[in-house]
């Protein structure tokens, strides 16, 4: 159990049979009446966001989440298969569970999988990955005066905006949080 006074951004709670993550919170102490905590909660399963108010000191169950490092071994149809390298247990995830992390996932890459019981809530990739450019337009000489960018397709199929000097076959570093180009490798 956790008190509403202890809510912080990122705190996970169980409410109505679901896991919710505190996105925003505000402790309010009105001049008249009792204090309360106004929160914005995001459902960890569906992604929906709701606003909820709790009385100050109200206790709610804290969600017990387990984070396990697993390796992406292969893709079976439309499912992504991950293996726990300690217990050799497999977890099969569909594209909806993967979210945007599917754009930067390579075979044999390790990722942190967040579980609530036996249900997968989130896939957390490393903050940056090295990917090979498989498709991009050739850069034109003298076209760099403005420091422009061009679209490039990387080995996972994701599109990344890269500087004009990047060519096919080069390895680049990509931020998995927003898909931005970080540099050459």
Curated annotation (Swiss-Prot):
Which pathway? Protein biosynthesis; polypeptide chain elongation
| InterPro entries according to UniProt | Elong-fact-P_C (IPR015365), NA-bd_OB-fold (IPR012340), Rib_uL2_dom2 (IPR014722), Transl_elong_fac_P/YeiP (IPR020599), Transl_elong_KOW-like (IPR013185), Transl_elong_P/YeiP_cen (IPR001059), Transl_elong_P/YeiP_CS (IPR013852), Transl_elongation_fac_P (IPR011768)
Where does it localize?
Answer: Cytoplasm
Going by the UniProt record, its keywords in alphabetical order are:
Cytoplasm, Elongation factor, Protein biosynthesis
Q: Which GO terms describe its molecular function?
A: translation elongation factor activity
* GO BP term (any one): peptide biosynthetic process
Chief place of localization: cytoplasm
- Keyword tRNA processing on this protein? no
Cellular component terms (Gene Ontology): cytoplasm
Q: Which SMART domains match?
A: EFP, Elong-fact-P_C
Role summary: Involved in peptide bond synthesis. Stimulates efficient translation and peptide-bond synthesis on native or reconstituted 70S ribosomes in vitro. Probably functions indirectly by altering the affinity of the ribosome for aminoacyl-tRNA, thus increasing their reactivity as acceptors for peptidyl transferase.
Q: Which family does it belong to?
A: Belongs to the elongation factor P family.
> What name does this protein carry?
Elongation factor P
